[in-house]
């Protein structure tokens, strides 16, 4: 038996591989020349045996008896026959070659452009057979969530730029359909202007979808009930802090580079109206102070004090006196003590650079810091940023739906949102690289509605170019393309260039209309000109010609039907389609749009989560002190201890 197996292996090793398509194409192209050689070769052989007084007579005999030349299938090997056959084949090849090289290139019907609308056949290779595993773009077009399709030429990144004026349905026709899909291994981060999306879709996400095993079979418990896989819902509410979970940026600092990133985000998103590039000295000085103080808090303060409240206390305690350069405040003394223990400490090195400023200059820097961090004077903001419940670093490890609620009229607290997004991108990329070998187990979809209102995310143009490989994608939702240029300036082109998909829902902003019209291209149309000349003898004329026309001009885009949209996918013809109708989705009945009973109540959910965290069976140590005992705490060893059950 072992001998038979070895023979089979050897036979497999000698299997002939199928020829390459390019090789087959070249062979087929040369077959006509082989036929010419063969026919001329055989006729030349027969011509030598034809009798006649002239060449014409011999050719006539050849034509009358040409079947005799092919009685033997093999070509003649006589030198004369081989030479004439070769010359004939080469001559035909030369004629074809030079005719093709010098010939005119006609593209009938495409003289002025070949633009056209895409159809079902064009989008078919990009659609996943499992409906839930698609990004819903229009009523008829979808894009698979699979980042590695069988044919690499159909691979597209999942970054989408959605453009639509006010009232065009960006939330209804794009954001909600994505949430209704609820794919198995996808988490969502949603910017929610006014906080309506979480109310309308939260209950559906909290319920989740049926849990499946590795074979795709729905799991059931011992009672036969379907086991559900709900989304873990997180909420940051910058409109009503009472309805927000806690977010502490200090919780996600892992190293000195994270301190620098956090400081940079604060500086970029809290610029005053009068802050200009000419005042660069002051911003750099502020940056040094922030790095020093945050570095001290991160490395030296207990975990419960690592927050913005402590940072404000440091700044408030940083008193300076113009008339007394030798004066040392409480913060100076803390850093001097730290320097004695660790002279090369990151915070110490930053603080020493800051202290190079004279008393008057330092006072101006502190005033700038106080003005920049003025929003933290609000007790509610300090409270929600006192500790962390967001688990930003775990969004790519578990089914999560993070809602970031922002005001569409007031940007006072948008710097907090920009801070969160900046940390989120960095945390997810680092976790993908360090823990999951480059790819997160859960694809993180960021649905950034009203993207222009969340502030500036540092180096976003570089992030969007690299997040694809880590299973992260961003949907940038704008009212016009000019909004992106206003915030990101020259980097706006890079950002749009890294979005393989563009969805236009309607609008009237001229720059946007112009760019979309140019991108759609031109088609070739037929043009008829008629003339009617009246005089002594009346004459009519009809002139036919071709001309070019935009597939959709700016004025046509401006008056586009409200139910229509335009989809552009890289490498595919554009689509003019109906917007997605959420009422036809199988999960529409789980939204509050269908039934008000489906409204999601954030406070109740947060209360329930708190009750889950506080297990009633868990025991805690309770220490009780009298005032006299507090005074003698260092010497008193008799502490009262109780148990809470």
Descriptions of predicted regions:
Residues 65, 69, 75, 111, ...:
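Intrinsically disordered, low-complexity N-terminal regions enriched in serine/proline/glycine
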Residues 464-566:
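Conserved ATP-driven motor cores of ASCE-family P-loop NTPases powering translocation/secretion/packaging/pilus
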């Amino acid at each position: 038996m072992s001998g038979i197996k070895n023979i089979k292996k050897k036979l497999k090793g000698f299997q002939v591989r199928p020829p390459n398509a390019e090789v087959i194409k070249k062979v087929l192209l040369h077959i006509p020349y082989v036929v010419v050689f063969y026919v001329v070769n055989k006729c030349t052989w027969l011509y030598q045996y034809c009798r006649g007084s002239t060449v014409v007579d011999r050719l006539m005999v050849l034509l009358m008896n040409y079947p005799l030349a092919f009685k033997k299938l093999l070509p003649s090997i006589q030198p004369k026959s081989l030479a004439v056959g070769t010359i004939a084949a080469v001559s035909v090849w030369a004629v074809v070659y030079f005719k093709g090289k010098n010939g005119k290139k006609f593209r009938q019907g495409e003289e002025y452009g070949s633009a056209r609308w895409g159809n079902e056949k064009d989008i078919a290779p990009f659609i996943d057979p499992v409906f839930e595993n698609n990004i819903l773009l229009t009523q008829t077009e979808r894009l698979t969530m699979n980042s590695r399709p069988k044919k690499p030429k159909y691979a597209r990144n999942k970054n989408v730029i959605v453009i639509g004026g006010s009232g065009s349905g960006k939330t209804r026709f794009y954001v909600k359909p994505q949430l209704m899909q609820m794919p198995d291994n996808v988490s969502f981060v949603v910017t929610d202007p006014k906080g309506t999306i979480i109310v309308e879709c939260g209950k559906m996400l909290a319920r989740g979808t049926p849990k499946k095993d590795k074979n795709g079979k729905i799991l059931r418990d011992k009672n036969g009930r379907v086991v559900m896989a709900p989304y873990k819902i997180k909420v940051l509410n910058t409109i009503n802090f009472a309805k927000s979970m806690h977010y502490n940026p200090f919780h996600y600092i892992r190293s000195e580079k994270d301190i620098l990133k956090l400081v940079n985000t604060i500086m970029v998103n809290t610029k005053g109206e009068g802050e200009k590039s000419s005042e660069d000295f002051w911003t750099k000085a502020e940056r040094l102070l922030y790095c020093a103080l945050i570095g001290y808090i991160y490395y030296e303060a207990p975990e419960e004090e690592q927050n913005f409240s402590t940072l404000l206390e440091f700044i408030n305690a940083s008193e300076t006196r113009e008339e007394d350069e030798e004066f040392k405040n409480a913060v100076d003394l803390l850093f001097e003590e730290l320097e004695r223990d660790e002279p090369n400490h990151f915070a110490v090195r930053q603080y020493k650079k800051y202290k190079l400023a004279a008393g008057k200059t330092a006072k101006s820097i502190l005033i700038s810091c106080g003005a920049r961090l003025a929003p933290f004077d609000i007790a509610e903001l300090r409270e929600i940023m006192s500790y962390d419940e967001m688990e930003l670093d775990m969004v790519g490890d578990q089914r999560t739906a993070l809602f970031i609620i922002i005001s569409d009229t007031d940007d006072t607290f948008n710097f907090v949102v920009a801070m969160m997004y900046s940390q989120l991108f960095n945390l997810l990329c680092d976790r993908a690289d360090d823990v999951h070998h480059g790819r997160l187990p859960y694809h993180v979809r960021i649905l950034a509605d009203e993207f222009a209102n969340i502030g500036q995310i540092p180096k976003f143009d570089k992030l969007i170019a690299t997040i694809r490989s880590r299973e992260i994608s961003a949907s940038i939702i704008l009212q016009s393309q000019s909004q992106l240029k206003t915030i990101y300036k020259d980097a706006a082109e890079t950002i749009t260039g890294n979005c393989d998909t563009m969805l236009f829902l309607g609008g009237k902003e001229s720059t946007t209309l112009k760019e979309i019209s140019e991108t759609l291209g031109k088609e070739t149309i037929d043009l008829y000109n008629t003339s009617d000349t009246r005089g002594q003898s009346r004459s009519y004329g009809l002139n036919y010609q071709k001309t070019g026309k935009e597939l959709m001009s700016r004025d046509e885009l401006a008056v586009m039907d409200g139910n229509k949209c335009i989809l552009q996918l890289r490498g595919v013809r554009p689509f003019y389609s109906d917007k997605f109708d959420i009422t036809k989705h199988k999960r529409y009945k789980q939204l509050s749009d269908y039934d008000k009973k489906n409204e999601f109540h954030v406070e109740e959910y947060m209360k329930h989560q708190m009750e889950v965290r506080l297990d009633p069976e868990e025991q805690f140590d309770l220490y009780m002190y009298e005032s006299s005992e507090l005074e003698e705490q260092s010497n008193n060893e008799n502490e009262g201890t109780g148990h809470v059950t």
